[in-house]
Amino acid sequence: MSKLFLDELPESLSRKIGTVVRVLPSSLEIFEELYKYALNENSNDRSGRHKKPRIDVSSDLLKTDEISETNTIFKLEGVSVLSPLRKKLDLVFYLSNVDGSPVITLLKGNDRELSIYQLNKNIKMASFLPVPEKPNLIYLFMTYTSCEDNKFSEPVVMTLNKENTLNQFKNLGLLDSNVTDFEKCVEYIRKQAILTGFKISNPFVNSTLVDTDAEKINSFHLQCHRGTKEGTLYFLPDHIIFGFKKPILLFDASDIESITYSSITRLTFNASLVTKDGEKYEFSMIDQTEYAKIDDYVKRKQMKDKSMSEELKAKSKSKGQATDGTADQPSILQEATRQMQDEKKAGVFSDDDEENDQNFEAESDLSDGSGQESSDGAEDGEEAEEDDEEDDEEEDKKGQSALNRDNSFASINGQPEQELQYKEFKEPLELEDIPIEIGNDDDEDDEDGSGVEYD
């Protein structure tokens, strides 16, 4: 058997084959047969036979790759696609006529808007995600290496209507007519994905359901802003997603180096994710109630909290903010959270504390100097706040202000505490008596030195 074919191979490969042949001389014949087979296959490819689809599939190949009922694995009609294009399209899983491999495509009638081949290699990540404040909808999110003709690179995001999807499954005979649990649809779609070579996670599955991979443990989502765009930040077991207004951001959790908190107020704060390559992404207007979940996620993923780093302390000092520089100082965000909790315990934010609400209304009447009170106590408190921002417009009623003020305190549940508050307010103001001319001679009950000053 000739060794001439070795001269046609790369030098490194030729040496490796030579090493094997010296140990096992009979293997030379096998190598030569393999070489000839490869030549024949290459010749067949050039002649157009046995051509296999590549990731960057050409339009000519798609023309021969027809979709029919016989090669369709699964189909959902009228899906709302949000990315990479915004259209109502049909989602189809089918087997290619070219080589029998599974394909995902989005169709408008018979026209392909997007097709993804070689799903086992091309789909990088896929997940079901909840739609905030819309329990009847669910997102299907997918990222991929490339699609046919490389027309798009943005992730695929589509919205599934749970009721419509259930009805389609029943019409296709995939579910019994009495089934109402949408998780049955999710389970079926996930199984089809596994059969076609990739996995769709379901990290927000109901905790009452059996889920052996426990994906739901670290998963939550919250509303925030990135710049001027409002969106949803999803914290998943292995990824963090911000969407779904372009550009959609996808982070591998292992690529996040650290997190910092800033712009902290009593109600909101900002969080910045810093990747290992130094890129920083800031998300603002996050509700204070979300801090505990973010902090737990950060600790589980062993990310660094650099909110109290020396660099940020130096920036705080330059702005005149005091800090003692101790290593074990609790973060300002934790202190803000505790302060908010203490205020809630004290009843500061209690809408049910009618006594405090009434005290506030009485004090508001004094502060604006109007002394006027409507029959509706709840509306009176709101009017008092508005009067603080405007000049008094009804000076012709000055003569009745003192009498109305006295009556206002007697009308609020008759509580001694509020009367005491009025006296405490009035007495120091009696140090300076300002005479007020009253047009009505019948108001003999008005007190001198009422403490109300008019412009």
UniProtKB/Swiss-Prot annotation:
Segments of this protein annotated with the region Dimeric region: 2-67
Subunit note: Interacts with the SWI/SNF, RSC and HIR complexes. Interacts with RLF2, SIR4, YTA7 and histones H3 and H4.
One Pfam family hit: Rtt106_N
A single GO molecular function term of this UniProt record: histone binding
Family from the record: Belongs to the RTT106 family.
Phosphoserine PTM sites in chain numbering: 408, 411, 450
Name of the molecule in the record: Histone chaperone RTT106
Any one biological process term the GO annotation gives: transposition
Originating species: Saccharomyces cerevisiae (strain YJM789)
